[in-house]
């Protein structure tokens, strides 16, 4: 019934098994990938024909984590998996980026890749098995695909590269790098690092690419035994006569349009040329081309002009050479009521970054499949439609915004202070107010400045730069600080962020079928030159963290109490701590070990809260005189409160030197009396004495004539 084919190979310290033929047999391609009890099912389904009028490649990648994979039941009312988590969204992008450029030009059939995590070993991240599975499922499906690809995670521990480290190993690693590529070349890199050199980063990419050949070989063997026949698909032949007509109509005008350096003006000119060409050629007559065909050919001519000029050594679209960074301006403290803010502008790309400080109560609690954890640093990237002069939907963040925010966060993580040195939680929001290339790297620069403006003691300044590539045969040009058009019409988007010491984040996406080590070396060297230039400007603008925090930022005051006193501070049903926070205007956090953190915008409020907590947690001292309140009258004495939550017995024999017949003759409920602590027994009961306190202070206890009368009088 089942024709099961399995391939197993060693991958670092792990065994990886790729299996097909038993599960999801009606899909175009389906594989189960297992790595040390982490199991991912990946399926591929492709439409046999493109939809009429389709002019783009509709590839969809879905990655979903099932809670049963970790032996858990989902929370919430419905007890089902809900909207994708950030991890799921980022993994979708991780799979999409290396496989998309391997589909042939002109292939517009709908393709859907679904990766489902079915079993999870908390030590083994499911993203690498999902990537390998996507490659294998596509390879055996017969869909036109120039793969397979391999994928590997690389760590850097004690000066050695580690293939596919576990999550425990990653905690001690200076590098977390994911690389994907074909047998011949690298297609995608995603990483965060602890200020590592360009040489170490390049070595990690090469190491990962070398090791992933094991996965590629296993997939090739799987295809030989279980692969479906390749589709008989060919790209539609080009209409050379139409190409010639369109080129004659638009080439000279496009050459002129790409001499315009202002983005909006240039875009309008290009749109007008395109509209003119469509009107001239798409007449509706028999045999006339449709708008999609003309539009695709127009894009090719556009790309040919821009790319040809750069490769010939002519100036770029905005007049720069290949190594020059656009003009940069930056300003900190731009928003008066925020904790920290900065406006970073590079050419026609602008980011307004805002930093907010909070307590550990404000940390994000992430309910991950591998287990719940807290995140003290959040970075959110927003790019509204006005940033590109367009109208559009405003709402929940799209995959692109989540991905860009994660990249900027990776860039800054390495320079954040340790929690013990800076106990605040931090939220950074990057509002992209203008966009013409590399807005994520503008978020890194602006975010660094905003954190410094908020008083965060960063270990170093961090800047980011986006590099591009134009490649034609053996000729290539690496571009520094690419524009949006250069990204759109080029072959690579290579983002590098770091400090003067080294790289903290690196992301590379290739639109052609891979690049070589030589090109990566040139790109990294050029990126370092640009990064140092930007860092110098940033250090001139903000040499270090602001000494005095914003008046609106919370001040944190931390101290410890006896853990046994925690319940006294919290009170029954939280009544005590709730009253404390409301009456002092502070936020109070208590840890299980007795560490208390008071967050307040003024020192006076924090001091008031500290004083009240000290009073609640104070221990009664034997021999000390206290001013207490009479809580209750008894036949044999009175109950007196000497500290919050600390009551003692004032026995009738300890009220006055003379004999006391009735307690009410000397004390009344609610009155303030001075008492001395005589002793406490092993059960914590406190014995008090008015007459001992009076003797020590030279006073005498007198009977009261009325409730308002003084209990004690000076001799």
From Swiss-Prot:
Enzyme class, spelled out: transferase
Start and end residues of each S1 motif domain: 623-691
Domain KH, residue spans: 554-613
Heme listed as a keyword: no
UniProt-listed PROSITE patterns: KH_TYPE_1, S1
NCBIfam families found in the cross-reference section: polynuc_phos (TIGR03591), PRK11824.1 (NF008805)
Designated name of the protein: Polyribonucleotide nucleotidyltransferase
Upper lineage: Bacteria, Pseudomonadati, Pseudomonadota, Betaproteobacteria, Rhodocyclales
